[in-house]
A protein has these predicted regions:
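A cross-family structural signal marking well-folded subdomains
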Residues: 1-180
């Protein structure tokens, strides 16, 4: 995390929301000041007491993914789309990394396609001026479904069921956004 100048608490928030059920939190969003109490109260999900090494290995694996997705080096496997996220939303934008961490079970084809979906969603959040709290709430709600996606076919079904209707609702107010 130090190599990308990232705050550990931000990673922990995204790690937890990407990998575990946070639906009991307000809007499904775990705040930084709630992380330690959430962990203390959710061993049943994390199983850090029963399987501490597996929990740490999962966290270590996701740190490496987080850094990899943040740097998005090379043009292979859809990394161009992750690079474009930074160009669209700015260097400080990192909300999409929560989605990328949730996508860790996807096969290579699905993951490459998912990076393109993420780029498109970020484009629509920027162009439609969707607030950060709405974007974060939306992304957090998608994580539980994204965790179960393994193939391009199941990704297509998720996009049709969840992403397209959400983006369409954001586009409803396009004319007024362009006139501002």
């Amino acid at each position: 995390l130090e190599s990308i100048d990232e705050k550990p608490l931000r990673f922990l928030r995204y790690f937890i929301m990407a990998n575990y059920d946070t639906s009991k939190e307000k809007d499904g969003i775990l705040r930084e000041d709630q992380i330690y109490s959430w962990l203390s109260n959710n061993n049943d999900q994390c199983q850090y007491e029963e399987k501490p090494f597996q929990f740490v290995e999962k966290m270590k694996h996701d740190v490496n993914l987080y850094v990899k997705y943040r740097k998005a080096q090379g043009d292979d496997a859809g990394n161009m789309h992750l690079k474009n996220v930074t160009m669209l939303a700015g260097n400080s934008y990192k909300l999409h990394l929560m989605l990328m961490l949730a996508a860790s079970e996807m096969d290579e084809e699905a993951l490459s396609k998912f990076k393109e979906v993420v780029e498109s969603v970020v484009y629509y959040t920027v162009i439609n001026r969707i607030t950060t709290n709405i974007t974060e709430r939306t992304f957090a709600s998608w994580c539980s479904e994204i965790r179960r996606i393994t193939s391009a076919e199941s990704l297509d079904a998720f996009v049709a069921r969840a992403v397209i209707p959400t983006v369409t609702s954001w586009k409803q107010d396009n004319q007024s956004n362009f006139m501002r």
